[in-house]
Regions:
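Outer-membrane beta-barrel proteins
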Residues: 2-181
Length: 181
């Protein structure tokens, strides 16, 4: 619990320094008998230069029916290269997953492509995530596609669909709001 409090405090402190903050709501539907959940996420991002961005975030999961809680705290680094309206990116991240019965570290790698036309940006990516210790059974592959619309230069809304396979099987519908500073 102390680690969760420290991570949350670090995230809130980071809000004062972030170039953008994203709030996201997720409706996760379990596949093949897996439980549904309602999730909320907050992420703070800061550009290091034109190619590199760092982020820190936390996601809270609430399982339908049981109301069991789990949390993922994660930090990542994204490299991106724009080529006209098309961009390619690769994100690497590490984090901790907390539940009422376990706590373990994990890593993820996500390559993808973006395409921007005016205020609309489409994104397609593939994420591989696994626990540092294979015994924790957290190996997943996520195929994702999303679109965002820049309402103003500082405000954007987005929608994303994720399909997760592996040790977890689900799909989710995700709505987000991003405020840039």
């Amino acid at each position: 619990m102390k680690k969760l409090a420290i991570a949350t405090l670090a995230l809130v402190t980071g809000l004062a320094f972030g170039a953008s903050v994203t709030l996201e709501g997720q409706n996760q539907i379990g596949d093949h008998g897996a439980a549904d959940s309602t999730n909320s996420q907050i992420t703070v991002r800061e550009s290091l230069n034109k190619m590199l961005t760092v982020d820190v975030g936390t996601t809270q999961y609430t399982t339908a029916g049981t109301h069991a809680l789990s949390t993922r705290d994660e930090a990542g680094l994204t490299a991106s290269v724009p080529v006209g309206p098309v961009g390619v990116y690769a994100r690497v991240a590490a984090g901790d997953k907390f539940t009422n019965t376990t706590h373990f570290g994990y890593y993820s790698v996500e390559p993808g492509v973006t395409y921007t036309v005016g205020a609309v940006t489409a994104k397609v990516g593939f994420r591989f995530r696994d626990a540092f210790n294979e015994a924790n059974l957290d190996a997943t592959r996520t195929t994702r596609a999303g679109v965002s619309y820049a309402i103003t230069k500082k405000d954007a809304v987005g929608f994303r669909f994720d399909r997760v396979t592996g040790d977890s099987t689900n799909h989710s519908l995700n709505l987000s709001y991003t405020r840039s500073f």
